[in-house]
Amino acid sequence: MEDFVRQCFNPMIVELAEKTMKEYGEDLKIETNKFAAICTHLEVCFMYSDFHFINEQGESIIVELGDPNALLKHRFEIIEGRDRTVAWTVVNSICNTTGAEKPKFLPDLYDYKENRFIEIGVTRREVHIYYLEKANKTKSEKTHIHIFSFTGEEMATKADYTLDEESRARIKTRLFTIRQEMASRGLWDSFVSPREVKRQLKKDLKSQEQCASLPTKVSRRTSPALKILEPMWMDSNRTATLRASFLKCPKK
């Protein structure tokens, strides 16, 4: 998984993820799934803010790379990925400037157009379950929540998706590509349910110990753990072509 992450994500994102894990005392050599999850979350946050600006009239506009009129105010302030001390300094500055209510937990973004903090979620589970977990954690109606899944589903506070459909489609396509690349390397199932994989492996090992003294009998059945670890092959026809400006996983 670590090799996949380093090949799949921009070095800047990988470096930020490494710093984040180090800050919390986590070992990326051991917590490889968390390493991948942090990189994915960081990239979604960056993609969420990319190309979105506010013009002189206070309107939200999309400006592509290379546009000569790019000297505009960024619509989103990226908080995720910063050192915690710096991140809280940014949050306090935003609150003092805009009058926004200070969140109890560090959010991921601030939307200058809608004047609200945003919590971004990327889940391998059901979007509504993860949404409720985020809502219970933030405990603030003023923090906007937007959840994306690897299956193309999304859920947002009051069904307000903030971004235009095309911008959200880019994020969904990127997540689907990550899922497909993981599956092609046999990494997806363990990424989705690492606890279940560990539970099944422990169960199988315990069964092997109990049966070690019994006569050996060849079985054609597949171990439950191996079934879980089998790659989930995806239909490549469903993968849309990503824009050249966005990161892609290298082909095998």
From Swiss-Prot:
Keyword entries, A-Z: Decay of host mRNAs by virus, Eukaryotic host gene expression shutoff by virus, Host cytoplasm, Host gene expression shutoff by virus, Host mRNA suppression by virus, Host nucleus, Host-virus interaction
Subcellular location(s) per record: Host cytoplasm; Host nucleus
GO molecular function, one term: RNA binding
GO biological process: viral RNA genome replication; viral translational frameshifting
Catalytic residues (positions): 80, 108
Superkingdom in the source lineage: Viruses
Pfam families, sorted: Flu_PA
Cited InterPro entries: PA/PA-X, PA/PA-X_sf
Record flagged with keyword Ligase: no
UniProt key word Nucleus: no
Coiled-coil stretches noted in the UniProt entry, renumbered to this chain: none
Residues the record marks as site: Important for efficient shutoff activity: 28, 65, 202-203, 206
Site entry (Important for efficient shutoff activity and nuclear localization), positions: 195, 198-199
Domain notes: The probable endonuclease active site in the N-terminus and the basic amino acid cluster in the C-terminus are important for the shutoff activity. The C-terminus acts as a nuclear localization signal. The C-terminus is recruited to host protein complexes involved in nuclear Pol II RNA processing.
Similarity comment text for this entry: Belongs to the influenza viruses PA-X family.
Function summary: Plays a major role in the shutoff of the host protein expression by cleaving mRNAs probably via an endonuclease activity. This host shutoff allows the virus to escape from the host antiviral response. Hijacks host RNA splicing machinery to selectively target host RNAs containing introns for destruction. This may explain the preferential degradation of RNAs that have undergone co- or post-transcriptional processing.
Protein name, entry field: Protein PA-X
Lineage: Viruses, Riboviria, Orthornavirae, Negarnaviricota, Polyploviricotina
